[in-house]
From Swiss-Prot:
This is Protein RecA. It comes from the Bacteria. Keywords: ATP-binding, Cytoplasm, DNA damage, DNA recombination, DNA repair, DNA-binding, Nucleotide-binding, SOS response. The keyword Cytoplasm applies. Signal peptide: none annotated. NCBIfam families: tigrfam_recA (TIGR02012). Gene3D superfamilies: P-loop containing nucleotide triphosphate hydrolases. Its main location: cytoplasm. Can catalyze the hydrolysis of ATP in the presence of single-stranded DNA, the ATP-dependent uptake of single-stranded DNA by duplex DNA, and the ATP-dependent hybridization of homologous single-stranded DNAs. It interacts with LexA causing its activation and leading to its autocatalytic cleavage.
Length: 353
């Protein structure tokens, strides 16, 4: 490099340093930095979904913190159950959670059964969509809340609609409200490392002859701002004799900005108990050759652990150390660094203690 080129490079470096110094002085330390600096967070922080299969499908071991997440699906598909499981997982690692119940339909007894600590859960039941999003904005800006769930986008009714007459035509009002709110929220969410989960409902587009007629409420803004979008569906029923005791559920990762998308996970949601962790361990264990299956019999490390999935599920509930051992082997097989958390005691077991 000749002297002239060296001098020009030195001048450019000085000018850049002065510009960076001016930006930091005006907007605060950390407003701009080199990606190679240690201050920049290279690894994405995640929280488990409560479903081992879904954690694997997400590619990073859970839902990313400091991002917007959308969970949508038909009625009674398990949207709220999944988000309550995420709240329980966040509380397990010491996080503060808030539930903005715009639908005014949260079943606190059910939430408690899923492992949610109600004493530490912040709950808001706003009157209007604006109020719900202002509360969300205030909680995010506080920097002290780790997870906020909004249930649901469809219930975020603009104030003008509530104060208006039945039958008033107010096109695009909710979409504009969501667009404005997300423009405000996104930067703050990233800075405070708070995860915001929007639960959404499905509507049918009229006159669609070809392609998927389904769409979500609240316009397109949420689709763009979400880092992860999950489509959750009920695909079957779980029966014990003639009685239906749960749902077979499929979740598809429709959008993923932190790992490859379009993967899917299947798991069981048991009524009154949530996602069946043991059921997932059995299915994924067999797929990873950690558990051997011969006919109806299941074996682990050469020892038979039960005949039929229901019996093995009960066996793993009673032998939690074995269940955690199998789960960690599955995680190693899939390259997930995070270890299996201890099983939370059920409501009945807590009552016995």
């Amino acid at each position: 490099m000749d002297e002239k080129t060296s001098k020009a490079a030195s001048e450019k470096a000085k000018a850049l340093a002065a510009a960076l110094s001016q930006i930091e002085k005006q907007f605060g330390k950390g407003s701009i930095m080199r990606y190679g600096d240690n201050e920049v967070e290279h690894d994405i922080q995640v929280v488990s979904t409560g479903s081992l299969g879904l954690d694997i499908a997400l590619g990073v071991g859970g839902l990313p913190r400091g991002r917007v997440v959308e969970i949508y699906g038909p009625e009674s598909s398990g949207k709220t159950t999944l988000t309550l499981q995420v709240i329980a997982e966040m509380q397990k690692v010491g996080g503060t959670c808030a539930f903005v119940d715009a639908e005014h339909a949260l079943d606190v007894q059910y939430a408690s059964k899923l492992g949610v600590n109600l004493g530490d859960l912040l709950i808001s039941q706003p009157d209007t969509g604006e109020q719900a999003l202002e509360i969300t904005d205030a909680l995010v800006r506080s920097g002290s809340v780790d997870l906020i769930v909004i249930d649901s986008v469809a219930a975020l009714v603009p104030k003008a609609e509530i104060e208006g007459e039945m039958g008033d035509a107010l096109p695009g009002l909710q979409a504009r409200l969501m667009s404005q709110a997300l423009r405000k929220l996104t930067a703050t969410i990233k800075r405070t490392n708070c995860m915001v989960i929007f639960i959404n409902q499905i509507r049918m587009k009229i006159g669609v002859m070809f392609g998927n007629p389904e769409t979500t409420t609240g316009g397109n803004a949420l689709k763009f701002y979400s880092s992860v979008r999950l489509d959750i569906r009920r695909i079957g029923s779980i029966k014990k004799g003639d009685e239906v005791v749960g749902n077979e559920t499929r979740v598809k990762v429709v959008k993923n900005k932190v790992a490859p998308p379009f993967k899917q996970a299947e798991f069981d949601i048991m009524y009154g108990a949530g996602i069946s962790r043991e059921g997932e361990i059995i299915d994924l264990g067999v797929a990873a050759n950690v558990i051997e299956k011969s006919g109806a019999w299941y074996s682990y490390s050469g020892n038979r652990i039960g005949q039929g999935k229901d019996n093995v599920r009960e066996y793993l509930k009673e032998n939690r150390a074995m269940a955690i051992e199998i789960e960690n082997k599955i995680r190693d097989n899939q390259g997930i660094v995070a270890r299996a958390a201890e099983f939370a005691p059920t409501a009945e077991e807590s009552a016995e203690d």
